[in-house]
A protein has these predicted regions:
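N-terminal amphipathic, basic-rich helices that act as targeting or association modules
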Residues: 5-71
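Alpha-helical support elements that line or immediately flank enzyme active sites
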Residues: 74-86
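Membrane-interface loop-to-helix entry segments
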Residues: 117-120
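Conserved small/polar residues in nucleotide/adenosyl-binding loops
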Residues: 123-128
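An acidic/histidine-cluster motif and surrounding catalytic segment
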Residues: 92-112
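A short, flexible low-complexity segment enriched in Lys/Arg and Gly/Pro that occurs
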Residues: 1-13, 93-99
């Protein structure tokens, strides 16, 4: 990986961290430890490795990211917002009643979320019918 690529990924990860702080400030709660410990990896996946398109979130040949530890949902929301899957203003609704950004990801509420996952150790994975994962 080139130095310029690494620099860009670090800058993007820093923006994603600010997105997490934005959600924490708006909601007053969240799992920051798990989120911050995985933000570099998830940023590198979405911005360097994965073949995804925010303008076509249901594209059949896309790569899929499954967050099995659903309590780390803020990392996924932060990166999806930075990637352009939804407006960043939605981050301000994290954890609020009827928000698309629940404490655990719900694939029926937000583009880019590939699976609904629960809390550890009770994690369950719900995939869409006929999914090719």
């Amino acid at each position: 990986m080139r130095r310029e690529t690494i620099r860009c990924l670090k800058e993007t990860a820093a923006k994603c961290r600010l997105n997490v702080v934005r959600m924490l400030r708006a909601s007053g709660h969240g799992h920051i430890g798990g989120t911050y410990s995985s933000i570099d990896m998830v940023t590198a996946l979405y911005f360097y490795k994965m073949n995804v398109n925010p303008e076509k979130p249901d594209w059949e040949d896309r790569d899929r990211f499954l967050l099995s530890a659903g309590h780390k949902s803020m990392v996924q929301y932060a990166v999806l917002a930075e990637k352009g899957y939804f407006p960043k203003e939605i981050l301000d609704t994290y954890g609020h009643l009827h928000s698309k950004l629940a404490g655990h990801p719900n694939m029926h509420k937000l583009p880019g979320v590939e699976a609904s996952t629960g809390a550890v150790p009770y994690t369950h994975l719900t995939l869409p019918p006929n999914s090719r994962v």
